[in-house]
From Swiss-Prot:
This is Protein YoaL. It comes from Escherichia coli (strain K12). This gene lies upstream of and overlaps yoaE on the same strand in another reading frame. Induction: Expressed approximately equally in exponential and stationary phases (at protein level). It comes from the Bacteria.
């Protein structure tokens, strides 16, 4: 019973934490590939113009 009560009291904090982590992860998931693609296409276009 005591363990159940403790688990119940920690659950809202857990949900909040997972929500924050999920939001942060989603932000990274969107931003990181965008930056990677931008730098990649930039270096690719540079190497292409350098080659031709």
């Amino acid at each position: 019973m005591d363990r159940h009560r403790r688990h119940f009291s920690i659950r809202p904090f857990n949900a909040c934490l997972s929500g924050t982590l999920c939001r942060t992860f989603r932000l990274h998931f969107v931003v990181t590939p965008a930056l990677f693609l931008a730098s990649n296409s930039y270096s690719l276009s540079r190497s292409l113009s350098w080659n031709s």
